[in-house]
Amino acid sequence: MTRSRARDTDVCGVTAAIAVIDGKWKTLLLWLLESGPHRPGELRRRAPGLSEKVLTQALREMEADGLVHREAYDELPLKTVYSLTPFGRDLAEALEPLAAWGHRRLERLVEAERQAL
């Protein structure tokens, strides 16, 4: 899905919402930031396989979409902290039923595999 879909007023609401969280890492970043503000290094450590470049790109897109707030502190060493905005918390809350559905689906898959044995 293209980034323009996130701003297209002629698409359904679900499509517009998915466009904002599209990509491999954004839902995980939302989930991590739900627990409170994090520095980029902390986010990378908690997301194995996430490169610095991709993390930076995802956080910039999430900031542009109003989901995260970036706070840069004027101190040495430089310190940057990301946190969810109220809009980002709203999205995280809206994703909870989808997460519950995903867990139920995984349970069904595990049960089906057990029965196949």
What residues fall within each predicted segment?
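N-terminal helix-turn-helix DNA-binding core of bacterial DNA-binding proteins
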Residues: 8-54, 75-81, 89
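Long, low-complexity, charged/polar intrinsically disordered regions in eukaryotic proteins
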Residues: 1-3, 9
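Basic amphipathic alpha-helical segments that dock to polyanions
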Residues: 55, 59-62
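Beta-hairpin "wing" of winged helix-turn-helix
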Residues: 63-83
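Amphipathic alpha-helical dimerization/coiled-coil segments
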Residues: 90-117
